[in-house]
């Protein structure tokens, strides 16, 4: 098995774990309506809850950049004060259409750790457009299996200084944003390198480069491209 094929499988497993947390499960089938009863309106016809009805505003400010995952999908924002706002990647198109860098936003949701929040809704304070966290529509179709999605990833290499450390819900480091905006993700238990803002950092792996920047799932990391060390002791 080639290094590239083995790496694709490893990345597929790592990304599948993140996708399983990010995309909500499909809704259960509705029970049949009893004879003579008035059926409820379809879910699509029900408006989302009003902003602030279920959760408070947990962050607000100007959008510094849109964050993307290794597939190139928008899965959050970074505000000018450094706050990282997480949002499900299946809403990438809706979020990137409603929110642009420089826009002022209000974020409704829940705080997580180290300056990050999980958004239930993001409001463009200027236009009033609001993007809600909601399941994919019933006609969206089933997503591709992780190993097929991973085939679309391409080798990427980045090098620079750490601008911000990304963390999971329990505060574990699972990625970095470099000063040029490149995003590197990695399993928290795999990193053998201390990462702090301002530190030199380099990585190679599989990911995407598009108009919003570069994002990759790391296979190896180091303080420079000439000093990379593998994250995995062996490939699957």
Task: Indicate where each model-derived feature is located.
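Short nucleic-acid-contacting surface segments enriched for D/E, G, S/T with interspersed K/R
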Residues: 91-108, 189-204
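Short boundary/loop segments of OB/S1/cold-shock single-stranded nucleic-acid-binding domains
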Residues: 25-56, 133-155
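Structural detector for short beta-strands of small beta-barrel domains
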Residues: 52-71, 148-170
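Bacterial N-terminal signal peptides that target proteins for export
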Residues: 1-8
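OB-fold (S1/OB) nucleic-acid-binding surfaces
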Residues: 70-87, 167-186
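The feature marks the first
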Residues: 41-91, 106-111
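OB-fold/S1-family single-stranded nucleic acid-binding modules
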Residues: 114-141, 210-236
């Amino acid at each position: 098995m080639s290094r590239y094929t083995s790496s694709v499988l490893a990345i597929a497993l790592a990304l599948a774990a993140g996708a399983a947390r990010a995309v909500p499960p499909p809704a259960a089938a509705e029970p049949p309506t009893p004879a003579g009863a008035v059926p409820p309106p379809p879910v699509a016809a029900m408006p989302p809850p009003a902003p602030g009805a279920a959760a408070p505003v947990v962050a607000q400010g100007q959008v510094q950049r849109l964050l993307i995952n290794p597939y190139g999908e928008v899965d959050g924002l970074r505000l000018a004060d450094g706050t990282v706002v997480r949002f499900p990647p299946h809403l990438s198109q809706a979020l990137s259409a409603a929110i642009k860098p420089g826009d002022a936003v209000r974020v409704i949701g829940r705080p997580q750790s180290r300056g990050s929040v999980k958004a239930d809704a993001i409001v463009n304070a200027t236009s009033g457009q609001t993007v809600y966290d909601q399941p994919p529509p019933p006609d969206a179709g089933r997503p591709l299996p992780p190993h097929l999605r991973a085939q679309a990833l391409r080798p990427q290499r980045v090098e620079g200084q750490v601008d911000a450390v990304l963390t999971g819900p329990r505060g574990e480091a699972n990625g970095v944003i470099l000063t040029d905006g490149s995003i590197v993700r990695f399993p928290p238990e795999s990193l053998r390198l201390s990462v702090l803002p301002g530190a030199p950092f380099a990585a190679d792996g599989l990911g995407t480069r598009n108009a919003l920047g570069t994002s990759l799932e790391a296979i190896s990391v180091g303080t420079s491209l000439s000093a990379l060390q593998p994250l995995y002791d062996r490939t699957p």
